[in-house]
């Protein structure tokens, strides 16, 4: 029972989702030549860092979590783990994760983890989430860190491939998060969290969702155009982007925004999982014969 509580406070669903993206970035960079010890160190290291960030987030948000239907039964809200113990737990998880990334992967992977952690805990959770409509935008940067860490654990450098991954996953976070805010509108309103749909209205949020999906679509194609991923990835990326955009556009005519937003959110998970899988298996070695070179 105690183990279950300590597991729940780390938000295992979020950890699992991030692991899929880490694997995508790692295998994309590995290009078929997998260093398995490095793979394990990277996965476990990122998992521990994400777990640490989630525990800190639970600690910081325990006051507003009480006001939201979705979060009112969280471990810290119900007092199943004391706040002091959660801080120690989060700190130990973070130290272990950063050490694994530093010594098991490379310093760059560790520093990327540190930056993602600081943005999520220090900038987003402590301030932006409660005080700015741009909190989601800032938080998207930390959400995009795991695949970049996986990629850079292999390459040891932040190149154009890493930049494209950062763009893809940051842009994906925006419509994904706005969809949550729409179908959980009353929760965010009750907790006085200034997300875009609450502050500017759902109609404005729909416009932003559409624009971000278009930008996401362009970013996903750049992996193939830049010679990092192959044609099969390109086809899947184009297909999921077009379908997701179509779902967003249908949102302008729906009668129930909450049902529409939940479906949009659900497909966002399918889309990013499909891309992570395809970049894992359909990689290319960048050379002069990239799609971008062929275009020019």
Swiss-Prot record:
Q: Which locations, inside or outside the cell, does it occupy?
A: Cell inner membrane
State which gene encodes it: cyoE
Q: InterPro entries, per this entry?
A: Protohaem_IX_farnesylTrfase (IPR006369), UbiA_prenyltransferase (IPR000537), UbiA_prenylTrfase_CS (IPR030470), UbiA_sf (IPR044878)
Mind telling me which residue stretches traverse the membrane in this protein? 10-28, 38-56, 79-97, 108-126, 198-216, 229-247, 269-287
The answer to whether UniProt assigns keyword Transferase to this entry is yes
Give the EC number. 2.5.1.141
What pathway or pathways are given for this protein in its record?
A: Porphyrin-containing compound metabolism; heme O biosynthesis; heme O from protoheme: step 1/1
Which NCBIfam families does this one have?
cyoE_ctaB, PRK04375.1-1
Q: Which family does it belong to?
A: Belongs to the UbiA prenyltransferase family. Protoheme IX farnesyltransferase subfamily.
What is the purpose of this protein? Converts heme B (protoheme IX) to heme O by substitution of the vinyl group on carbon 2 of heme B porphyrin ring with a hydroxyethyl farnesyl side group.
Q: What is this protein called?
A: Protoheme IX farnesyltransferase
Chief localization: membrane
- Taken from the record's topology, the Cytoplasmic segments are 1-9, 57-78, 127-197, 248-268
Q: Which GO terms describe its cellular component?
A: plasma membrane
Name the membrane topology term: Multi-pass membrane protein
Q: Which reaction does it catalyse?
A: heme b + (2E,6E)-farnesyl diphosphate + H2O = Fe(II)-heme o + diphosphate
Please name the GO terms that the record assigns under molecular function: protoheme IX farnesyltransferase activity
